[in-house]
Amino acid sequence: MTEYTTRAEWTGGHAGVLRCSNGPSFPFSAPEKLKGEAGVLTPEDAFVGSLNTCFMLMFIWAVERLKIGLVSYSCDATGFVEDRLDRTSRFGRLLLRPRIVARGCTREAVERALRLAEKYSLVWQSVNAVVELEPEITVAPD
């Protein structure tokens, strides 16, 4: 079984440093509106970002296997927080909006790559919220 580890170290206030097993470290804090610091990673950013980055990497993997000529890829991701009556909250929905420009393929091939990325994205498959995909696909002429 594969394992991924991190270590969170408190640095004072509502902040800390996240140390990842593959090397990088990131300062983090609560969001500014919750007594956090501006300009650093928040757990909420990391959650939405982990879905966005994992999905992108799996899309690149699928594009390579399907021999799609990828010209460009970018994706905006938004997490929608639901506030509950008991004063707790959760991400109820996440929305990915990838913008893809490909060449030398069909739109259907790009859509297949998107489906494969969804299926094989570890983070997507692990999320307990609804994840929606609204792609903007452009197939450029050869």
Please provide the spans of the model-predicted regions.
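Extended beta-strand/beta-hairpin segments
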Residues: 1-49, 57-142
